């Protein structure tokens, strides 16, 4: 039986001029024709068998299946084609108009089937009372929550508490939320903390721990008030900020009187070489060893090591350049030693000096 079908297809391909009317069943990457016509290919295959192969199926080398019809009606309904010892009865091929009518009938049939199925679904939803019964909950919603365990008066009480109570957060209040006694107490704590810290000074983080305030803005407001209090009262102390530290210092106007009390002379541990290196770092920070050497024209390693031991400079990371050299900046101790609050108070360099002759380090 399979051989008969193959012979029939071969004869048709060799002898018949196939029509231009084609219906393509393309591969998955190009199935626009199939989607446009919305055909049931299984149904069409059945139709081919029922009509004695009136529509011919041909598979090409590219594995794309196509359906062809014959446009030329030169063949009679009972014309015979001889192939070897076998004679095959060939029915008359369909015309283009017949093919279109056939496709249209398939679409109409499919549409009718869809309408019948839709009508069946609509009939199922006709009974609204049955639908309401299915959607109705098994228990009343109010009955579930109206139990004896819930007291209505307690519920009202809870709502009143939520409405009248104010929620406070640790960092939600400002200086205006503190009364005068609280502000005075905080100032007293700051005074004691500054006295104990001495020349080391205290940072904002230290004051947060002692005062219990968590906002830097709150502390700065109270520190400004405390500084004004010292000025108004003509106190012998002054509150000054050096870098990130706050310190209590004596008034400069009392310098002569205090010099009679302090008779010890202090010797600086810095040589000329170390002072020059420290000055270069202060004016160019953050800076590298190579830049210091380019300015001084000498190897700065001994001076850098000495300044690190004296805690006058610190390592502040590495530069994002080849080799990743270490960056150096001045430390908090630098501000304390030279009485500088910030880098803007450094003496301005004289740009008119064209030559710089450092002291010979052989004497140091």
Curated annotation (Swiss-Prot):
Stored InterPro entries: ScpB_csome_segregation, WH-like_DNA-bd_sf, WH_DNA-bd_sf
A Pfam match: SMC_ScpB
GO terms under biological process: cell division; chromosome separation
Domain of life: Bacteria
Keywords carried by this UniProt record: Cell cycle, Cell division, Chromosome partition, Cytoplasm
An annotated GO cellular component: cytoplasm
Cystine pairs: none
The keyword Signal belongs to this UniProt entry's keyword annotation: no
Places the protein is found: Cytoplasm
Major subcellular location class: cytoplasm
Stated role: Participates in chromosomal partition during cell division. May act via the formation of a condensin-like complex containing Smc and ScpA that pull DNA away from mid-cell into both cell halves.
UniProt record similarity statement: Belongs to the ScpB family.
Quaternary assembly: Homodimer. Homodimerization may be required to stabilize the binding of ScpA to the Smc head domains. Component of a cohesin-like complex composed of ScpA, ScpB and the Smc homodimer, in which ScpA and ScpB bind to the head domain of Smc. The presence of the three proteins is required for the association of the complex with DNA.
UniProt-listed PANTHER family: SEGREGATION AND CONDENSATION PROTEIN B
Protein name: Segregation and condensation protein B
Gene that encodes the chain: scpB
